[in-house]
Amino acid sequence: VNSTNKLTPSSLREAFGHFPTGVVAIAAEVDGVRQGLAASTFVPVSLEPPLVSFCVQNTSTTWPKLTGVPMLGISVLGEAHDAAVRTLAAKTGDRFAGLETVSNDAGAVFIKGTSVWLESAIEQLVPAGDHTIVVLRVNQVKVDPNVAPIVFHRSVLRRLGV
């Protein structure tokens, strides 16, 4: 470590950004309209029962729309979705512009061409500072091993080196 920064939200954001993560889309149909958000805080939690989690900012205006649906679709984004990540993370506009999606009977929305689809239901919400940890129970999974991942590192989307 070369230097010590004063502990501030921006210094923490910079420090946390040094940890590379994947990016997922969390989406569902709400009253016939696709709603969704991007998250780089996705984490597998448990195999038995099958649980995953992600964190969402308490100030999110999209998350309250998703909390009442029976099922959420989680799509693990790949290299082809670098532009989509910014669109999904936008504060305004159509977050699904230019994206092909599929909805299932439970209302979960998935993005085509991603490496993993997880149909999930909210299991638990855990308050954690300025975020909420969302624990989801996985009901169905679909995997495409041929889709290369995208990595979010230091606020830049990168491809995984081979």
Locations of regions flagged by a protein language model:
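Basic, polyanion-binding surface patches
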Residues: 1-162
